[in-house]
């Protein structure tokens, strides 16, 4: 998503 917030989830 934005940044690594939902990218790692």
Swiss-Prot record:
Q: Write down the superkingdom of origin.
A: Eukaryota
Q: Which cofactor does it need?
A: Ca(2+); heme b
Q: What is this protein called?
A: Cationic peroxidase
Q: Which family does it belong to?
A: Belongs to the peroxidase family. Classical plant (class III) peroxidase subfamily.
Which BP terms from GO are recorded?
A: hydrogen peroxide catabolic process
Give the note describing cofactor binding and stoichiometry: Binds 2 calcium ions per subunit. Binds 1 heme b (iron(II)-protoporphyrin IX) group per subunit.
What organism does this protein naturally occur in? Betula pendula (European white birch)
- Could you tell me where this protein is found in the cell? Secreted
Q: Report the catalytic activity.
A: 2 a phenolic donor + H2O2 = 2 a phenolic radical donor + 2 H2O
Give the keywords, sorted.
Answer: Calcium, Heme, Hydrogen peroxide, Iron, Metal-binding, Oxidoreductase, Peroxidase, Secreted
- One MF term in the entry's GO annotations: lactoperoxidase activity
Q: Which GO terms describe its cellular component?
A: extracellular region
Q: Any idea what job this protein has? A: Removal of H(2)O(2), oxidation of toxic reductants, biosynthesis and degradation of lignin, suberization, auxin catabolism, response to environmental stresses such as wounding, pathogen attack and oxidative stress. These functions might be dependent on each isozyme/isoform in each plant tissue.
EC class of this enzyme? oxidoreductase
E.C. designation(s):
1.11.1.7
Higher taxonomy: Eukaryota, Viridiplantae, Streptophyta, Embryophyta, Tracheophyta
